[in-house]
Structures are given as C-alpha cells and as structure tokens.
C-alpha cells in the first residue's frame, strides 16, 4: 500500500499511532477532537450506513509530530471492480485545519485518490463537538454513494478521451498555475505520464494523466490534500481537449 504523506515531515502511521499522540488541553472555548476517535467513529458509522459495501483498507498519515492527520477508509462493492468508495478525513491539534470529511474513490491498483464535491467541515470545536461531528459524519456518508457513482462515471468518460503529450503538458501548466500541482510535483507528473508505474495507465487518455497527477498529490501536505484533489477533478472533468 502506498503512503499518503511523503512530503517533508509527513509519515505513514497506524491507528494505534494515532491513539498515542497526546491531545492538546481543552479550554473554555475549544475542545479537541482525537485523531483516533475520529478515525474509529467514522469507520463505525460508515460501516453501518454503507449497506452492500465491504471495508477494503485504511491509510493514515501524520505530520508536524502528530499535530496534523489525514486518513482514508476505502470500501468495495459491485459498482466498480477497479475503484472503491473512499472517505477521506483530516484533523489537527494545532488549529491549522478544522475537522474535514470528503467523499471520493480510490483506484485499487495504485491507491490513487479521487475526490469530488465539497469538503464537509466542522468549523467550531465547542463543548458539543461530538454531537456536531456525528451529525456531520452521518450527513456526509448519506451523500457518499451518489458521489462515488459520479466519480466512477467520470473515470469512464476520461478513459475515452485521448490526450497527446502537448495537451498533457498544457494541462500540467494549467494545474501549476492554479496551485493544484506544486513545482516539486511537476517532475513526478511528467514521469508518471511519460513512463507510468502501472500498466493500467499506459493508454494516452485523460484518465492516465489524472492518475499521473494523483500520484504526485500523494506528497501534498495534510491541510491541502482534499482541496487539491477536488480542484484536479473539477478542472479535468470539464475539459474537452
């Protein structure tokens, strides 16, 4: 399984590692959300609401000595043999980002993540934080199957769209200009486009380019992972090159 966080200071971790990170102190106006409890509760609620889906795997990553966390739960069903429904989530102990949940898909062959729609964000960490979080989780999971179906349809459409090298490099410039791909990630996209690590992406299609980009986005910091994946999807799904 590929690591989610390979940028400087980021590291792959386990669920038990999340539990070992000390919680910051609670104040009158701020109640922290445990990385471990968020991951565990999200898996339990998803397992109860996603009927017909089976847990395929989980990935967790931390940065800033555990102050930032990003995770993905992936579920498999009969809709797609190559992709699974993914629930991405993030949290921080240093107030650098709020609890956020996004729905998408994971490509089984490479663990590349595709996200679409909006990020459900819990903006306040008050004394009722867990009631608010449970409502956020349930609402997001109820929308998840619709989002997953859309991503599967988008992926199929992208597979059918030919993309030559010149157009691919123009798109790469567009993604860089829109702060989706960083300067350090550009060589990764170029390498994965010209010489893919996986045979599944050897065809010259928008889908292959998409996965070259998501391979590079594995090095994005936790507070940018969701936004950059969603921006990538929004840019590539509407283009007709």
Question: Residue locations for each model-derived region?
Answer:
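N-terminal low-complexity, intrinsically disordered segments
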Residues: 1-67
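Intrinsically disordered, low-complexity regions enriched in serine/threonine
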Residues: 1-3, 10, 57-61, 76-241
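Charge-dense, intrinsically disordered terminal/linker segments
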Residues: 28, 43, 74-80
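Short acidic loop-to-beta-strand element that houses the catalytic metal-binding Asp/Glu
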Residues: 67-74, 86
């Amino acid at each position: 399984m590929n690591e989610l966080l390979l940028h400087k200071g980021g590291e792959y971790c386990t669920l038990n590692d999340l539990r070992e990170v000390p919680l910051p102190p609670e104040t009158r106006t701020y109640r922290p959300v445990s990385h471990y409890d968020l991951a565990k509760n999200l898996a339990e609620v998803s397992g109860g609401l996603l009927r017909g889906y089976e847990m395929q795997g989980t990935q967790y990553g931390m940065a800033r000595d555990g102050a930032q966390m990003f995770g993905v739960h992936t579920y498999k069903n009969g809709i797609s043999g190559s992709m699974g429904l993914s629930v991405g989530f993030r949290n921080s102990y240093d107030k650098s980002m709020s609890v956020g949940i996004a729905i998408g898909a994971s490509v089984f062959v490479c663990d590349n993540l595709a996200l679409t729609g909006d990020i459900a964000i819990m903006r306040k960490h008050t004394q009722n934080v867990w009631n608010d979080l449970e409502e956020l989780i349930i609402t997001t999971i109820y929308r998840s199957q619709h989002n997953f179906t859309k991503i599967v349809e988008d992926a199929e459409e992208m597979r059918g769209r030919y993309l030559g090298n010149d157009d691919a490099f123009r798109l790469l410039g567009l993604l860089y200009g829109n702060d989706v791909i960083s300067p350090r990630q550009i060589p990764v996209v170029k390498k994965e486009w010209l010489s893919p690590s996986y045979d599944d992406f050897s065809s010259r299609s928008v889908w292959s380019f998409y996965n070259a980009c998501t391979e590079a986005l594995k090095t994005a910091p936790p507070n940018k992972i969701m936004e950059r994946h969603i921006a990538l999807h929004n840019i590539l799904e509407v283009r007709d090159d």
